[in-house]
Amino acid sequence: IQLLSNIKRVVTADFLDKETYGYVGDVSHIQTPILEQMLDNQMLPVLASIGYSKEGDMLNINADYLATAVAIALNAKKLVLMTDVKGVLENGEVLDSLTSKEFQEKIDQGIITGGMIPKIESAVNTVLAGVGEVLIGDNLVTGTSIIS
């Protein structure tokens, strides 16, 4: 297993707002040839949620945003976002699937709140960008499938 973000600068990022957030960034580019070569050689790339600015500053990146950017860049068929809950919950039950329209409705109803909002928002954007499915779930890979 190789950690690539620190060694080969696989991820280029832009500062979100240096004065407000400090060294926090958003993905601007993924060096896909390095990742594709590893995958072609049956290797599993492991990326830290770190990117580098054009000036060489190391920037923290939200892990879900990085994962979705990599999935889009690699034209992945599926992305699994691991979390500490079994999936998107409604009344304590895991939803089997969720569309972008249902996502907004459930936010408006107060069903989806807090840290799950940016996770699902990035998942919805990933599906809309062409990744076939995003699964949000726990280490047992039960979960909620985000579909278009």
What are these regions (language model features)?
Residues I1-S148:
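C-terminal catalytic "cap/lid" subdomain
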